[in-house]
UniProtKB/Swiss-Prot annotation:
Enzymatic reactions: (6R)-5,10-methylene-5,6,7,8-tetrahydrofolate + glycine + H2O = (6S)-5,6,7,8-tetrahydrofolate + L-serine
GO CC field: cytosol
EC number: 2.1.2.1
Binding site for (6S)-5,6,7,8-tetrahydrofolate: 121, 125-127, 355-357
GO molecular-function terms, A-Z: glycine hydroxymethyltransferase activity; pyridoxal phosphate binding
Sites annotated Plays an important role in substrate specificity: 229
Protein name, UniProt field: Serine hydroxymethyltransferase
Modified positions (N6-(pyridoxal phosphate)lysine) in chain numbering: 230
Length: 418
């Protein structure tokens, strides 16, 4: 019987080898992709539970199937914990991803063809904030705002003038590659001035917001969307928050039946675990450590005139570096660092001149290394290793030295093999 085949290693060796190889990669590589993190074993256990067997279309207390009394408890726990964590009146935990959460928010707030003001992808926004290749750009009339050409930071006066000119129905704040704190109160004032809704996508900073080390958008935005991984350190999934009861009903309808069928209750259970972890006072220490580590790492690049730190610094978990003085483009930098077991991604910088497939910059985030227990000293060491590798990109002997130093670091801070 299928129930006898409980061991993946014995039943499907080919698949197991790939899983095991990924486990080894995570153990022995330094993870600096800003959208990635390392979840607890409790989060993984919940996601791998028998809840994966259960269909539960609808919401707690109002399902289309029977036998949902247990998953109602699970989902209610996740909802209540999310509300408490972020100080929101309403929470939807069913969105399968941040993109699904954003799609639901758009459906709740605007109609197809409406004008939306969102952060341009090249300035640090996200695909779902109006990229022409994404559903958002195809469905709605997005106009992009950028950063100041000199400071590479948001210029709220310029955004206000742009909002006056285009008269959007919705303004989207939030980013996927912006290293500075966002003033959500100013964004709400801009939205109110032109009679627009304000939606905030806090996917990247949700963990920092939950811990109180970054300003919260919840008091200001009509709707807040997020992922549950990244700095929040939960399973891959989406979350939607609001303080408006009428909008909460629209959000629920947009998710089901608008965009999705049955929710992934095993993932929702893992979200509930992650929310409980984030409610622990120790999570604030973790979030502050992310900020401290990121600032320390960024400072090393700022002190080296062969590199240019975008906007001159960072206030959160991420920063961008222009690497073109030492290597041709960000793509080559990403590939080279992969070879020495440091994982990050190429990234466009504001007012980019290279192809998006090459880019001038790299994006670096410190959530994952902080989860391993690394601190300021290790963050500075990693920055120096990156510089050492990039500057000596054609010196195999030096690159091998970097590999060995990376291995020493990862061995000193094991992930799951403790």
């Amino acid at each position: 019987m299928i129930f006898d085949k409980g061991n993946v290693e014995d039943f499907d060796k080919e698949l197991w080898d790939a899983i095991h190889a990924e486990e080894e990669r995570q153990e022995h590589h330094i993870e600096l992709i800003a959208s990635e993190n390392m979840v607890s074993k409790a989060v993984m256990a919940a996601q791998g539970s028998v809840l994966t067997n259960k269909y539960a279309e609808g919401y707690p207390g109002n399902r289309y199937y029977g036998g949902t009394e247990c998953v109602d408890i699970v989902e209610t726990l996740a909802i209540e914990r999310a509300k408490k964590l972020f100080g929101a009146a309403f929470a939807n935990v069913q969105a399968h991803s941040g993109s699904q959460a954003n799609a639901a928010a758009y459906m709740a707030l605007i109609e197809a063809g409406d004008t939306v003001l969102g952060m341009d992808l090249a300035a640090g926004g996200h695909l779902t904030h109006g990229s022409p290749v994404n559903f958002s750009g195809k469905t709605y009339h997005f106009v992009g705002y950028s950063v100041d050409a000199d400071t590479e930071m948001l210029n709220y006066e310029a955004i206000l003038e742009q909002a006056k000119a285009v008269q959007p129905k919705l303004i989207v704040a939030g980013a996927s590659a912006y290293s500075r704190s966002i003033d959500f109160e100013k964004f709400r004032a801009i939205a109110d001035h032109v009679g627009a809704y304000l939606m905030v996508d806090m996917a990247h900073i949700a963990g920092l917001v939950a811990a109180g080390v970054h300003p919260s958008p919840v008091p200001y935005a009509h709707i807040v969307t997020s992922t549950t991984h990244k700095t929040l350190r939960g399973p891959r999934g989406g979350l939607i928050l609001t303080n408006d009861e009428a909008l909460a009903k629209k959000i629920n309808s947009a998710i089901f039946p608008g965009l999705q069928g049955g929710p992934l209750e095993h993932v929702i259970a893992a979200k509930a675990v992650a929310f409980k972890e984030a409610l622990d006072p120790a999570f604030k220490d973790y979030a502050q450590a992310i900020i401290d580590n990121t600032a320390a790492m960024a400072a090393v690049f700022a002190q080296d005139d062969r590199f240019r730190l975008i906007s001159g610094g960072t206030d959160n978990h991420v920063f961008l570096v222009d690497v073109t003085k030492v290597i041709a483009n960000g793509k080559l930098a990403q590939n080279l660092l992969d070879e020495v077991n440091i994982t990050l991604n190429k990234n466009a910088i504001p007012f980019e001149t290279l192809s998006p497939f090459k880019t001038s910059g790299i994006r670096i985030g410190c959530a994952a290394i902080t989860s391993r227990g690394m601190g300021v000293k290790e963050s500075q060491t990693i920055a120096r290793l990156i510089i050492k590798a990039l500057v000596n990109h054609d010196q195999e002997t030096i690159l091998e030295e970097v590999r060995q130093e990376v291995r020493q670091l990862t061995d000193a801070f094991p992930l799951y093999k403790k």
